[in-house]
Amino acid sequence: MNALLIYPEFPDTFWSFKHALKFIRKKASFPPLGLLTVATMLPDEWSKRLVDVNVANLTDKDLEWADCVFFSSMVVQRKSAHQLIKRCKEAGVKIVAGGPLFTSEHEQFKDVDHFVLNEAEITLPSFLEDLKNGCAKPVYRSPDFADVRETPAPLWKLA
């Protein structure tokens, strides 16, 4: 399975610090920590790639390579998330989404195939098991909180 992890673009606002980043030789303010942690939790035999749209463009080759895409977004990334999800849907790629934006507004994203909401450390394993067995549901959620002492380290080699 080829899993493409996509982090949508932050809009250019005062709080994005976009214009100040060049002074400290950085391309983005906020690394995709959630997606890098999810990447660690995906099966080892899967091939994984990360596209952080804040530092690189999503290409047609990326979408051709992918069997599925995983999105994580904050609410401020809503516009970019909608645009990228539409593009993935048009490419015929299976879409999985989680993170703050989708946890609070998943009803607004009709093109997403599967939502892994709330704490991925809790909900992602159930989704992956169902996916392996061919019975993945549209929505996975739990009211429980993850114990951060048990959260795996992010897969930094993708960054």
Language-model-detected regions and their locations in the chain:
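Acidic, low-complexity intrinsically disordered segments
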Residues: M1-A159
